[in-house]
């Protein structure tokens, strides 16, 4: 299957079949009429005197109207949230790269959440910071770094997440309404506040260097319960590369969502949010937060899907960067990525990530 074919799910293919039926229908009808016109005429046996018949007034045809679905929880039809996992180890968000980058599409009409992962090593144009050392390009995760207060390159607000959002929009046409950034310390506290997570790993993840016996860095395949610190370690490991790490991160996010949607936890969410409000960086206000909490009560695990770009459209490369020097990057045809992102914006998702079909959704 070509990369572009992956964009169109079975739902669109079914629509294509329906359109074909409508195209063929006039041809079938005209065929039937032609047969009636060209059939031989029998010799009349009697002349029938016509009688007067009443002319019926045609009944006007009513044009069907489509009733739009209601928008739930007082929210907008769709809300886009940039979710950033920062590798910053301090309590503040003054420095740090974007360790994970997810664009979240929240649908308030057909209650659902979709998360799209962007490779952090994409080499992109970073807008608006050329006056700082002539920087025009960098890795996608550097856009978050340059916008943080420790660098101060971002002069348009929104800190690191704001510059990262503008970079995603500039390069790929991504839409971002709000952002949430979580650093390592905050992530550990959130997982522990939830009582840990239950995850089903489809493969062994071993982050130990040769000769190391640190059991914290070894994760067996299968079901297991993890607390905050080990969950953070698992999220950061990439023994198989960045794409497999993104897959594991999605499994962790899925396990977190599943835990948060439990009735025993859902009613505690306001307390959890209040307890973590000083350790999470976000521009989501009280109104939007209330809308999201309301929608959460209408969701289950089946309403949350993780989608990803097919790995086959990417390749590893190297570039001479003004800051990093000769560095490894991820290369891709930006036009293809823009098409995927546009489909995501519109709610026409491509197939859910295959790696998630391992039991965590059951």
Question: Which ranges hold each PLM region?
Answer:
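Terminal accessory/targeting
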Residues: 4, 27-30
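Bacterial N-terminal signal peptides
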Residues: 18-27
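N-terminal secretory signal peptides that target proteins for export/translocation
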Residues: 1-12
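Non-catalytic, solvent-exposed segments at the cell envelope interface
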Residues: 32-362
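Residue-level detector of alpha-helical hydrophobic segments embedded in or interacting with membranes
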Residues: 4-5, 21, 114
